[in-house]
């Protein structure tokens, strides 16, 4: 891998464009990923926000679920925001019928924990590993983490709830940093991808 990592954004649903822009601003070569062969060509992957049940079903429908699981198990760096966080969880406290996860982070999440769409909000969040003060977190029907395993590091909390975690090469936030123009969380992820190679 060159100094410029190739990072994909799972492009089944969600704010793909915003993640592509954030990754490019953090000095990565960013590209959408829709098929298993595209997944095989990236050094790391962002799983964006969206609707977690729909994303899970689309990943199965498009033949992406097993390749995603295999790459994450093999150590590919992965970053999930909001619904992406849910997909990276080992367990969902309140899953919808037919909802599957990729796994990769030893955590239990609660879907839509911060409320409905009209209860969305922005908040300053101190994120471990991100310098320069708090990041502006956009919480849209956001999950929170109920509990983590011994290998999972809590890197941010808001209102007494876990909203960002890291486990080895996996990162997850319940908020959307890509919607704010502050790309420091993406820069942290790009550094994680670089460190693997």
Swiss-Prot record:
Stated name of the protein: Pyridoxal 5'-phosphate synthase subunit PdxT
EC numbers for this chain: 4.3.3.6, 3.5.1.2
Known partners and oligomeric status: In the presence of PdxS, forms a dodecamer of heterodimers. Only shows activity in the heterodimer.
Stored Gene3D superfamilies: 3.40.50.880
SUPFAM superfamilies: Class I glutamine amidotransferase-like
Active site: 82, 176, 178
Keyword Hydrolase applies: yes
Pathway(s) this gene product operates in, as recorded in its UniProt entry: Cofactor biosynthesis; pyridoxal 5'-phosphate biosynthesis
């Amino acid at each position: 891998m060159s100094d410029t990592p190739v990072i994909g954004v799972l492009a089944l649903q969600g704010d793909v464009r915003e993640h592509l822009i954030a990754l490019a601003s953090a000095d990565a070569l960013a590209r959408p990923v829709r098929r298993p062969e595209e997944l095989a060509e990236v050094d790391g992957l962002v799983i964006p926000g969206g609707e977690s049940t729909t994303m899970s079903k689309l990943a199965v429908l498009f033949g992406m679920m097993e390749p995603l699981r295999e790459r994450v198990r093999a150590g590919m760096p992965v970053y999930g925001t909001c619904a992406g966080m849910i997909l990276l969880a080992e367990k969902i406290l309140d899953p919808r019928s037919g909802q599957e996860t990729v796994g990769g982070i030893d955590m239990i999440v609660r879907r839509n924990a911060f409320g409905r769409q009209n209860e969305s909000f922005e908040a300053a969040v101190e994120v471990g590993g991100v310098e320069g003060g708090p990041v502006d977190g956009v919480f849209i029907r956001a999950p929170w983490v109920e509990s983590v395993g011994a290998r999972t590091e809590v890197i941010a909390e808001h209102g007494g709830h876990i909203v960002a975690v890291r486990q080895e090469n996996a990162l997850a936030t319940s908020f959307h940093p890509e919607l704010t123009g502050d790309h420091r969380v993406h820069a942290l992820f790009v550094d994680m991808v670089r460190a693997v190679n």
